Amino acid sequence: MRIRSLYSIMIVFILLAFALPAGAFNCNVNVTGLSFGGYDVFSAIPKDSAATITVTCNAPPQNPNAPIPVSISLSPGSSGSFAQRQLQRLGGPELLAYNLFTTPSFSTVWGDGSGGSQSQTNLVTRTTPWNATIFGRIPAGQNVPAGSYSDVITVTIEW
């Protein structure tokens, strides 16, 4: 039995942060990339991975412990659809279906609230950062050629 694998499947996250007026809440964001590693086209098991978005915030001096509502939304990527995002093979037209989810049960698509997706909102305080996990899944049974596949997702953080 010959096994073909895909290596270096990467999703690149682009972070957009919004500047706020002086004296407003100050937040910092760190995003780790999501890499699926090798994908076995003969496996009956989906390929899963995860990434983390960490948001830390400081409130203004007059109320340093104030909770700050933070919202995180993700773009649909190059496919333009939350129903099924797609990784494209570098140098070729081949596509590999995948999606990003809010929970490890892979039941809720993480997006911007449109097209059946949901954004995520949480309260962040000076002492309590938000470590939001993005759960990625490539469904099994996709017959694609070996190569590097990627997509670009824009992560939008609002506070």
Spans of features found by a protein language model:
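Positively charged n-region of N-terminal signal peptides that target proteins for export
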Residues: 1-7
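Bacterial N-terminal signal peptides
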Residues: 8-19
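Short, highly charged low-complexity linear segments
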Residues: 13, 112-119, 133
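Short beta-strand and strand-turn-strand segments in soluble, beta-rich domains
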Residues: 27-31, 108-117
